């Protein structure tokens, strides 16, 4: 799924060959690439999250911007399908900042005045996708 933007988060080609794919900026590797682009520090997503948890202003600002992009992507699903819940998976879904802040950000991008879709953390950790495919 693409989210065509002309801003600083739309710099990297996706492995599928397109530009603007959600994977290129919402995945852990995408998050790390964008952090490097902005701050010239090569940190993985887990370290960026730890820095934010420890009050690092640069990491906090970056995570806040990341959450805005996550909200844009989730809003596309909500606007089209209107699911009762969306369960997030993968390593980045372990970011505690997501679950406390995403609903206020979603309100900027959904068509409705309210957001009734629950954004949930998976129950089985990073192996949730594998379990779901089984």
Where do the model's predicted regions map?
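ATP-binding/phosphotransfer module of carbohydrate and carboxylate kinases, centering on a glycine-rich
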Residues: 5-134
């Amino acid at each position: 799924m693409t989210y065509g933007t002309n801003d600083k988060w739309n710099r990297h080609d996706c492995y599928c060959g397109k530009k603007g794919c959600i994977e290129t900026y919402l995945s852990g590797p995408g998050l790390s690439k964008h952090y490097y682009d902005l701050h010239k520090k090569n940190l993985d997503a887990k370290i960026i999250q730890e820095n934010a948890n420890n009050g690092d202003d640069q990491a906090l600002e970056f995570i806040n911007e990341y959450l805005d992009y996550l909200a844009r992507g989730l809003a596309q699903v909500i606007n089209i399908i209107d699911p009762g819940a969306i369960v997030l998976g993968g390593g980045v879904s372990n970011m505690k900042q997501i679950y406390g802040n995403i609903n206020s950000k979603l309100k900027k991008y959904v068509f409705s005045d309210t957001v009734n879709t629950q954004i949930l953390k998976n129950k089985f950790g990073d192996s949730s996708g594998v379990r779901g495919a089984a």
